[in-house]
C-alpha cells in the first residue's frame, strides 16, 4: 500500500510498519497524519538505545512502497497537552530581540569576532546589548573594539571580573577551534599527498 486512498487515514496511536523506497523498514506509533500532504509522523524506538527517549520520523507516503497496520488504536488517544502561551510569547519576544540585536550589529559594521563574543556573553548574561559598536553588559561593563580582555571597562568588582573571564574563555575556545582546524587541514593535505 503506497498511500491511503480518499477517506482513509491512520489513527493516532496505531502502530504501523513502512518500507521506504530506500528499502528501510520503519516501525512505530502514529503521532500524526496529514492526508493532503500524505505525511505520516511516527514515534519509533530510540536509535540512541536510551529507553526514556524516542525518535520521531516524518514519512512521506509518496516514497513508501508498503504500509502495514500492526495494531489499530485500542482506545481514544490522550488529549493534546496544553500550551503555556505566556512562555511561548516570551520565547518569541526573546528570539525577536536576539535577531534584532544581531541585525543591529551587522548594520553598525561590527566585526564577526565582536558578534561572536556578544553571542557568547549573551548565552550566560541576558542583560547584554549593543551601543554603537560597544557591547554593554549589565549596564556596568563596556567592551569596545577589538573586544579583547583589555577592552573591558567598568567599575572594579565582580561584574567586571566575571565578564573578563567570559571574554578570556571565549578567545581560548576560538584559538582551540582554530588550532584543531589547522591540524585537520594539515592531516588532510598530508593524506592527499600520500595518496597521490
UniProtKB/Swiss-Prot annotation:
Gene Ontology MF term list: RNA binding
The Sm domain, residue ranges: 3-70
Domain AD: 81-175
SMART domains, per the entry: AD (SM00995)
PROSITE patterns assigned to the protein according to its UniProt record, in alphabetical order: AD (PS52001), SM (PS52002)
InterPro entries found in the cross-reference section: AD (IPR047574), Lsm12-like (IPR039683), LSM12_ABD (IPR019181), LSM12_LSM (IPR048478), Sm (IPR047575)
One Pfam family per UniProt: AD
Protein family (similarity comment): Belongs to the LSM12 family.
Protein name (record): Protein LSM12 homolog B
Organism: Danio rerio
Amino acid at each position: 500500500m503506497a498511500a491511503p486512498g480518499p477517506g482513509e487515514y491512520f489513527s493516532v496511536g496505531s502502530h504501523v510498519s513502512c518500507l521506504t523506497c530506500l528499502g528501510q523498514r520503519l516501525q512505530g506509533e502514529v503521532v500524526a497524519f496529514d492526508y493532503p500532504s500524505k505525511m505520516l509522523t511516527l514515534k519509533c524506538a530510540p536509535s540512541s538505545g536510551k529507553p526514556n527517549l524516542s525518535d520521531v520520523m516524518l514519512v512521506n507516503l509518496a516514497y513508501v512502497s508498503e504500509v502495514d497496520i500492526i495494531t489499530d488504536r485500542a482506545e481514544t488517544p490522550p488529549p493534546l497537552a496544553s500550551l503555556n502561551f505566556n512562555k511561548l510569547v516570551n520565547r518569541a519576544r526573546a528570539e525577536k530581540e536576539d535577531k534584532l540585536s544581531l541585525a543591529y550589529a551587522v548594520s553598525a559594521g561590527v566585526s564577526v569576532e565582536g558578534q561572536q563574543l556578544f553571542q557568547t556573553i549573551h548565552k550566560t548574561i541576558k542583560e547584554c546589548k549593543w551601543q554603537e559598536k560597544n557591547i554593554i553588559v549589565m549596564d556596568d561593563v563596556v567592551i569596545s573594539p577589538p573586544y579583547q580582555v583589555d577592552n573591558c571597562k567598568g567599575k572594579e568588582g565582580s561584574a567586571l571580573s566575571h565578564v573578563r573571564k567570559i571574554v578570556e574563555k571565549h578567545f581560548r575556545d576560538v584559538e582551540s577551534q582554530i588550532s584543531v582546524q589547522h591540524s585537520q587541514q594539515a592531516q588532510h593535505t598530508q593524506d592527499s599527498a600520500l595518496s597521490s
